[in-house]
C-alpha cells in the first residue's frame, strides 16, 4: 500500500474555566489557523491543539509498536516536546488563556500520507480480493465504508465517484519507498497550507519523460508532472507569440502562478496555423487473440468491431451505466485492438481491463506505452506541413 505513517502532534491543554462553563464537550467552534498550520478544538474543559507546522516526522511501519507493546494505541507515538514548543507559542499568541493552563496529555499521533495526498481505496492490483480502505482522514471519512462495501459487492462504488482515491491509480514509480517518503515530506507542511490548484511538486521529477525531452528543454519548456510523466505546458521559445497576439499577464498575482500568456499564444497560433503536441504520456495497451475484438466490444459503449484500420472514441461504463472512463480504441487487425487512454487514468484502466478479461486465455493484454510515442500535428495548416515530409495521401 503506497503510504507512510506520519506524525501529527496534538496536545490537550487545560483546565480552563471559560471552557468548563459551557457544560458541553464542544461549546465553541473549531479554530483553524492557516498562518501557523494549527487548529484549536474544545474538549470539555480543555483545548486540544493540533499542529501541522512541525518538521515532517515519518515512521517505517516496522517502528510502530504492536497492540501489546503500545501504552494506549499503536498510533500514538512518544511526544517530542522540542517539535511542539514553537507551535504552542503561536497558539498562546492566538489565545492567551492557553498560557495559564498546562499540557495534560500530548501525543505524536500517526496518520497515513500517500504520494498524492488522496486515500487508497479498492481492490489491490497485486492481490485479487485483497481490499484497501487506507489513508482515510476525517475529511473523507463519512461515506467511505459504504463506498468500499458497494465496491466489494458490485465491483464498483455506486454512492459516489471515488476514482481519485482508487488504489489502482498508482504507477510502479509511485510505489517505491523513496517516492512515497519524498512526497510525504514535501507535502506535510502544506496539509494546512493554501496550495495553488496548479502547483507542481518540487522533488521526484523526471521519472518518465518522452523521447523529445532534451529538445523540449532546449526550447524552454515549462513542464507539469502528470502522475509520473513530464508534459510541456508552454515553451519559452514561443514568447514572441505574446506580442503577436497582444497578450498580457493576468491582473491578479495568484492567477499568474503556474501560468504564462505564452500558452494562450500557442493555442491561438495552433488554431490559425498549426502546432506540434507531445502526446507521449498517453498510456497504450493492446488486446490480442481470437477473443480480443469480442472482449473489446464488451468493454466499450461504442462498436469496436469496425473495419481494420478504423479507430473509435468511446466511454466505458459499469453495469449500472455509470461512467468509468473515456478513451480511444483502434482495430489494428482481425484479432488485435489497441487502447489509448490518458495518463491520469492509465493505472485504473489497465486494472479494469485485466480484471474483466475472459478466463479462457482467448485474450492477452500487453502494456506497450514505453515502446511507442505519439506526436500530434494539429491545425488548419497541418496537412501542408506534413506533406513536405511524406508522399502519402493526406486527404483522409
Which residues does each PLM region occupy?
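Conserved hydrophobic/aromatic beta-strand scaffold that supports enzyme active sites
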Residues: 10-12, 30, 39, 120, ...
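Short hydrophobic-aromatic micro-motifs
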Residues: 39-41, 47-51, 132, 231, ...
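Short, low-complexity Ser/Thr-rich regulatory SLiMs
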Residues: 42, 123-125, 329-333
Amino acid at each position: 500500500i503506497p503510504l507512510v505513517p506520519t506524525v501529527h502532534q496534538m496536545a490537550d491543554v487545560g483546565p480552563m474555566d471559560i471552557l468548563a462553563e459551557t457544560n458541553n464537550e464542544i461549546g465553541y467552534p473549531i479554530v483553524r489557523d492557516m498562518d501557523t498550520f494549527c487548529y484549536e478544538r474544545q474538549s470539555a474543559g480543555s483545548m486540544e491543539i493540533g499542529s501541522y507546522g512541525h518538521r515532517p516526522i515519518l515512521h517505517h511501519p516496522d517502528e510502530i509498536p504492536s497492540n501489546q507493546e503500545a501504552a494506549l494505541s499503536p498510533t500514538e507515538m512518544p511526544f517530542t516536546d522540542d517539535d511542539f514548543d514553537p507551535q504552542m507559542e503561536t497558539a498562546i499568541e492566538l489565545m492567551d488563556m492557553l498560557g495559564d493552563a498546562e499540557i495534560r496529555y500530548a501525543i505524536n499521533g500517526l496518520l497515513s500520507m500517500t504520494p498524492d495526498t488522496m486515500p487508497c481505496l479498492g481492490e489491490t492490483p497485486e492481490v485479487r480480493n485483497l481490499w484497501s480502505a487506507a489513508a482515510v482522514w476525517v475529511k473523507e471519512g463519512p461515506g467511505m465504508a459504504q463506498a468500499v462495501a458497494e465496491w466489494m459487492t458490485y465491483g464498483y462504488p455506486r454512492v459516489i465517484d471515488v476514482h481519485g482515491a482508487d488504489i489502482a491509480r498508482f504507477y510502479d514509480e509511485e510505489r517505491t519507498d523513496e517516492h512515497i517518503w519524498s512526497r510525504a515530506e514535501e507535502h506535510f507542511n502544506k496539509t494546512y497550507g493554501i496550495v495553488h490548484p496548479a502547483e507542481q511538486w518540487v522533488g521526484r521529477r523526471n521519472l518518465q519523460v518522452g523521447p523529445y525531452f532534451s529538445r523540449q528543454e532546449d526550447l524552454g519548456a515549462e513542464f507539469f508532472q502528470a502522475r509520473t510523466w513530464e508534459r510541456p505546458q508552454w515553451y519559452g521559445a514561443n514568447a514572441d507569440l505574446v506580442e503577436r497576439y497582444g497578450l498580457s499577464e493576468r491582473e491578479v498575482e495568484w492567477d499568474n502562478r503556474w501560468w504564462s500568456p505564452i500558452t494562450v499564444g500557442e493555442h491561438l497560433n495552433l488554431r490559425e496555423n498549426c502546432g506540434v503536441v507531445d502526446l507521449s504520456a498517453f498510456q497504450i495497451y493492446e488486446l490480442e487473440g481470437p477473443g480480443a475484438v469480442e472482449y473489446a466490444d464488451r468493454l466499450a459503449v461504442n462498436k469496436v468491431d469496425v473495419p481494420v484500420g478504423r479507430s473509435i472514441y468511446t466511454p466505458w461504463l459499469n453495469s449500472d451505466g455509470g461512467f468509468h472512463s473515456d478513451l480511444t480504441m483502434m482495430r489494428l487487425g482481425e484479432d488485435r485492438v489497441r487502447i489509448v487512454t490518458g495518463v491520469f487514468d492509465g493505472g485504473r484502466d489497465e486494472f479494469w481491463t485485466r480484471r474483466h478479461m475472459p478466463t479462457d486465455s482467448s485474450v492477452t493484454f500487453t502494456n506497450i506505452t514505453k515502446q511507442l510515442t505519439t506526436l500530434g500535428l494539429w491545425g488548419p495548416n497541418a496537412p501542408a506541413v506534413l506533406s513536405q515530409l511524406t508522399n502519402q495521401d493526406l486527404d483522409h
